[in-house]
């Protein structure tokens, strides 16, 4: 076994109120895919937390639950997961949806380039050969296709999927003083695109790998309620701000 396989690996799953889909996600985790799972849930009831803990007790991977009484935002939730991972000595984090759009059985696709090939950041892409997408909402599908084109133009780094939240990275990137994820303007969807831009432009070794993105016909919770029409600036803003030097 490669020595890199012993790097502690954490799965971070941000969730908004949802329990039913999260339970489905947890059942797909296989032993030793990651060392620990950190669920960060906003606005969960006592019953929600009970169901999460009951589902967590049935799998072989340790699960830590962080519960926020108020809705903090997906960026805030991911940051809490990152902070937890850093505090527990994890070296790699996998971030994924808690609403059953991402398949934990595909986590090795994201981890292999980091563990065996020296990559710092691996982005899952539904558009690469071998990737899969089903039931994508029309507007979101169009936006997801077009947005990487503008990222490629702006960063000079070719990419095929930017809005897919299924990705993995070495936690050491956050020790770089040029990356400051602890800014309040990153509490919502902005954080993911902030990290993406920094990795693209600061010389970290990154690649894309094919993954699946399967949308349910109706989806609630799990921080999947993003709308390109309503939330477009939270998605586009980090690229504009950082490119123009307005934000750090």
Name the predicted role of every residue range.
Residues 41-52:
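A conserved acidic beta->alpha catalytic loop
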């Amino acid at each position: 076994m490669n020595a890199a396989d012993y790097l502690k690996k954490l799965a971070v799953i941000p969730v908004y109120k949802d329990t039913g889909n999260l339970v489905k996600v947890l059942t797909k985790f296989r032993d030793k895919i990651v060392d620990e799972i950190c669920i960060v849930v906003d606005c969960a009831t006592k019953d929600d937390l009970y169901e999460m803990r009951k589902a967590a007790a049935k799998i072989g991977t340790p699960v830590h639950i962080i519960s926020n009484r108020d809705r903090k935002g997906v960026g805030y939730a991911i940051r809490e997961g990152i902070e937890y991972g850093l505090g527990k000595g994890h070296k790699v984090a996998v971030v994924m949806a808690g609403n059953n759009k991402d398949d934990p059985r595909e986590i090795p696709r994201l981890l292999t380039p980091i563990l065996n090939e020296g990559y710092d950041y691996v982005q899952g892409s539904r558009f690469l050969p071998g990737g899969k997408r089903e039931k994508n909402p029309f507007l979101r599908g169009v936006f997801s296709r077009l947005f990487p084109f503008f990222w490629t133009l702006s960063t000079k780094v070719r990419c095929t999927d930017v809005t897919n939240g299924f990705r993995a990275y070495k936690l050491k990137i956050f020790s770089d003083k040029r990356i400051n994820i602890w800014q309040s303007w990153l509490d919502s969807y902005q954080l993911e695109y902030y990290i993406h831009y920094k990795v693209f432009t600061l010389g970290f070794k990154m690649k894309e790998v094919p993954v699946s993105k399967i949308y349910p016909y109706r989806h609630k919770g799990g921080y999947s309620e993003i709308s390109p029409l309503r939330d477009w600036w939270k998605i586009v803003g980090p690229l504009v701000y950082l490119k123009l030097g307005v934000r750090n």
